[in-house]
């Protein structure tokens, strides 16, 4: 077994798998179990690094969410919510249906993040990984985009209030982190950065580069919307061009990163054209930023990712590996993992850590897309630096 670092905590419990709207819903937390077992089977995760999530208290949830919304989620947990109330709080559609004990299961996701926050701030660990979290669409008073409670926003507010931390949220999910953004739009103690597929064609339709915050929060919201069919080179170029100036200027005490892996070309819900190359590279760059600017303090969350067999386990494994300073993996996946899960998978499981790219389609407009993305990224970087002068 490889040498493991005790500096990193990894949140896992089978309880996190209970966050499930229904069996056909695309948000399937089985991806968390698949990732965890892949890491364990590959001798990359030690059981001693795993920490159990607690259940967040109502007061903690209400750091972001409204009292009446939390009460509505409790009612929905027991099937005693009216149709009008369900509609009011976003609980009456295919995206965010009601399920048994949804309050407890959602509060457990939040509690996992707060567990890591306390461990880091007490000096017991340097960084943490919570792949079961990353519910960035939840609004203060409404469910949205498969998200009930916004664990990222709550954790950011918790760190700011309880520990007086300046918090930077870096969100690389294909969907704009709207719930998180609006939670801090007029605040200056938390900066939100989101690079995502443009909202012109993808939920939630927000995240335009002109959304920059308001009042004392102006300049503390940064959005980098990319064109559909953006490929690896352009995504990574725009990310690195825009994110490091934000870190340098804001000078956060801690980073929270949302590692949605739905920028992958195999993801069924988005239109970006990236591969595992980007998904492996992103967390290592965020780790570099944390090491360079926050003394290593970072919590890495999961997020979107709806190809749970061929994409999520390999990509999310590297989120954790970046935290423990292990290199990007190559070669064959553990046979033990493949043999266990091949009977459950709806498609052929990958055999190697690398993408095969046998079904990858190169877009004829790659140069045009990349130039448009870079022009916008340079504009955003220039605007941001001008606000700091």
Swiss-Prot record:
Lineage of the source organism? Bacteria, Bacillati, Bacillota, Bacilli, Bacillales
Q: Kindly indicate whether the keyword Repeat belongs to this entry.
A: no
Q: In which pathway does it act?
A: Ketone degradation; acetoin degradation
Query: Is-annotated flag, keyword Isomerase?
Result: no
> From which residue to which does the signal peptide run?
none
Role played: Role in growth on acetoin or butanediol. Involved in the breakdown of these compounds used as a carbon source.
Can you say what this protein is called? Acetoin utilization protein AcuC
Q: Keywords in UniProt for this one? A: Acetoin catabolism
Biological process terms from the Gene Ontology for this record are: acetoin catabolic process; epigenetic regulation of gene expression
Q: Name one GO molecular function term.
A: histone deacetylase activity
What is the native source organism of this protein?
A: Staphylococcus aureus (strain COL)
Q: Which family does it belong to?
A: Belongs to the histone deacetylase family.
Top-level taxon in the UniProt lineage: Bacteria
